[in-house]
Structure formats: C-alpha cells, structure tokens
C-alpha cells in the first residue's frame, strides 16, 4: 500500500484559479471510516497495493486505491476512497436502502500502466480522472449516482479509446455483500 505521505499521483483535476478558501475544508472520512472502507475493498476486491493520493481537495478528498491483478482476477481494480464522506441526496423512495454513501470502482486490463510517469499521459490517466469526476458529481448536482444512468462525455475519454460514456452498476464479480 502506498505511503500516506507519498503523493504518487501529482495529476490535479482542479482549477488552479479557485480561491484557496475553497480547499480549506473538504469532507473527509474519520480514521475509523477509512479503515472500514479499506477493509471492505480488501475483503471484496483484494489487497490494496498502492494508493494515488489526491494533492488538492476542493470538496471531498478522493484517493484512488489500486488492487493489482491476481490469478482469480486478471485485471487491476481501482476503487475510490473518499467519495462516501459526502452523503448523497438520495430520493426519498430509496432512503430505506441507505444509499447515501458510495465509492466507485473500475476494472482495467492487467497491462494498464499505473506508474507515476504514465499518469502524466492522458491515455493512461483517463480512468482515474473519470473516477474523480464521477466522485464529485453528487456534490455538484446535489443528487446521487443512481444505478445505470448513462453519463455521456460527448467525446472519447482519451485518444487511445473509443469509450465516451459510463454506466454506474453494482460490481458483478464480487461475492455477496461486495456492493454494500
């Protein structure tokens, strides 16, 4: 796992022209909540090998946990840690399901480049940018990320992919409870 002081990813998604005041009080997990999220990630996705720590946090602090490929899962799993510090505005009819907190995950091929140098290249960085943008969407829109609303980027995420939209769903390859 990455060292908390090691800013493995110095790619910033934030506009440098924003006032410093906006960055002074991001919503963050308590230490206990962070341990619970990390425990959940490790139980359902695997051991966290590294963490890309966010350098500037305007509203929530979103780190990206990296779970490497294994024999059982021949792909990287990237999971946000921090999105759930903000309670989403969930529709009343769904309140009983306690969906106001969530994290996001994405699976990437086993040969995906996830070293610091490759993060300077949008061809490798775009999945991390996507996770960070989606993690902040409930704050920007004062709503929640529901199941299966397509979000169209209107352009390819990067020059090396034709992917241009995302559809949030529950993880399909985890054991029972992994979606909790």
What would you call each of these model-derived segments?
Residues 1-180:
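Short linear motifs embedded in intrinsically disordered, proline/glycine-rich low-complexity segments
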